Amino acid sequence: MSIAQTKRFTLDEYHRLGELGFFHEDDHIELINGEIIEMASKGTVHETCLRNLWKQLPKIVGDRATLQSQAPITLPPKSEPEPDFAIVQNRDDNYLSSHPKPTDVLLVMEVSDSSLAYDQDVKIPLYAQAGITDYWIFNLFDNYLEAYSKPYQDNQGRYGYSNKRIFLSDEIITFPCFPDLSLDLAKVFPPKRNF
C-alpha cells in the first residue's frame, strides 16, 4: 500500500508559482510550514474589528513604525503568513526589496473568530519559532485580547510563548514595542454577539 505524501513548498517555489500565475489577486492564501493554506473567509464581526483597528492603529503608531495589513511576513525556510496586522520597523525602501523578516517584526496581530483554533495551535508555534517577540490575538469568541510574549522552545522541541496575558474588551493595553503608546480595546471589539 502506498501512502500519499503532502508536497511541501519552499519560499522560492511558492513565489515562483505566484509568478507563473497559479494564484490570483483575490486568492486568500498563505504559505505555512511549506503548505499552501487557503485562509478562512471573514464574517461581519471580523470585518468590523478590522475596520476598528484601521481607525485606531495608524493614529497611534504614526511614523514610529510601519503598519501593514494582510501582507506577507517571510519566515524562512517555508512560511509566509499574512497576518491581519503587523507593526514592523521602518525601512528606507519601505519593504520594496523584500517582505519583512522576523527581525523586522515588532508585533503581529490576528483577528480570530472561525480561525481561532488555527491562530492558537498553528500560528503560536510558527511565530515563536521565528523569534517574533509579541503576538496578539483579538479573540472574538471570548471577546478579549490574548497577548503572547517571550518565545521559547521546550525540551521536546515544541515552540510557544511563556507569557500569555488576557485583556478584556474594556481594558487599555500598551504596545510592547512602544510602551508609551496604548490601545483602548473598547474602540476595537465590536459588541458581543453569539456565533
PLM-predicted stretches and their roles:
Residues 1-195:
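Gly/Pro/Ser/Thr-rich low-complexity, intrinsically disordered segments predominantly at protein N-termini
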